[in-house]
A protein has these predicted regions:
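Extreme N-terminal starter segment of soluble prokaryotic enzymes
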Residues: 3-8
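Short polar catalytic/cofactor-binding loops
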Residues: 12-17
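Cys-nucleophile CN-hydrolase/nitrilase-fold catalytic domain and related Cys-dependent amidase chemistry
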Residues: 19, 28-109, 113-115, 181-205, ...
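Short, acidic/polar
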Residues: 21-30, 160-165
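Active-site catalytic loop in hydrolytic enzyme cores
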Residues: 64-67, 94-187, 191-202, 264-273
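CN hydrolase (nitrilase-like) catalytic-core segments centered on the catalytic cysteine
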Residues: 64-87, 155-252
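Short beta-strand scaffold segments in enzyme catalytic cores
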Residues: 88-90, 102-105, 141, 232-234, ...
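A short C-terminal boundary segment appended to hydrolase-like catalytic domains
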Residues: 260-289
Length: 289
């Protein structure tokens, strides 16, 4: 079987305390990849801001940026500079009073290949995202790029198998999850590893069930009462962990994958062949009793 290898770089950083130095850190990490043959660069969720949804505060809407913001243009230029596809998550101001948790995908020439807006919006202690973000209206549409067809989803989307399945059925070669998740300091520390394991397990399950690759890019560091657990990782179509960062790691994690493995896996593990779509109508109900 022929090969289709791509090199992926995932950036795991922490909020530095101010916008200029924070963006400068990510720019420096990305530019260090220049000339090294990377095809895809993935940034964490809301990387350009602090994790502001830890509370409800109308002033934080000022952190949102529009599509023509200089930060967007800068990262389009970086994609061109690196000759790499870039997944660029951002706090999007779509219109007055309309805000999304979004991600652009930039092509190697800096053009916009596509846009995804986060579909599932949490509202939990320290994750009050419903106050800020309108659920996305882009649906689950893979984005075709020169680095493969990307199924971009964002953070809380990772807990919903339907999103991963639809992206895969529509041809995604890789499921990509920019993320901002961690522990609250009020939680008992003995449950920390269990939560982290659940997070990795659910995405490994998506890789296995759909026989596709998964890339998760989480942020690290501590912000107020939240400590983000990092642990960005790449999983193969059989769920095997190809690369994983430590919680404390700050920098670039790299992996090379062969997109042809998806086809090979689906021949040996034909989950899509054996689906019983005639039995699945109940999945569209809120509750089945």
């Amino acid at each position: 079987m022929s090969t289709n290898k791509i090199k992926i770089a995932t950036l795991q950083g922490k909020w530095t305390g101010d916008f200029e130095s924070n963006n400068a850190w990510y720019v420096e990490q990305a530019r260090a990849l220049k000339g090294k043959g990377y095809d895809l660069v993935v940034l964490p969720e809301l990387f350009h801001t602090p994790y502001f949804p830890f509370e409800e505060n109308a002033d934080f809407f000022d952190l949102a940026i529009e599509k023509d913001h200089p930060l967007v243009s800068q990262w389009q230029s970086i994609a061109k500079e690196l000759n790499a596809v870039v997944v660029f998550p951002f706090f999007e101001k779509r219109a007055r009073g309309i805000y999304h948790n979004s991600a652009f995908v930039f092509e190697r020439d800096g053009s916009i290949a596509g846009l995804y807006r986060k579909s599932h919006i949490p509202d939990d202690p320290a994750f009050y995202e419903k106050y800020y973000f309108i659920p996305g209206d882009t649906g689950f549409e893979p984005i075709k790029t020169s680095a493969g067809t990307l199924g971009v989803l964002i953070c809380w989307d990772q807990w919903f198998p339907e999103a991963a399945r639809i992206m895969s059925l529509k041809g995604a070669d890789v499921l990509i999850y920019p993320t901002a998740i961690g522990w609250m300091d009020s939680e008992p520390k003995e449950i920390y590893p269990r939560q982290q394991d659940s997070w990795m397990t659910v995405m490994r399950g998506h890789a296995i069930a759909n026989r596709t690759f998964v890339i998760a890019a989480n942020r690290g560091g501590t912000e107020g009462h939240l400590t983000f657990w990092g642990t960005s990782f790449a999983a193969a179509p059989d769920g095997y962990i190809l690369e994983k960062c430590s919680p404390e790691f700050l920098g670039v994690s790299t992996v090379e994958i062969d997109l042809a493995e998806t086809e090979e896996n689906r021949r040996w593990w034909p989950h899509f062949r054996d689906r019983r779509i005639d039995l699945y109508s109940d999945i569209l109900k809120i509750w089945c009793k």
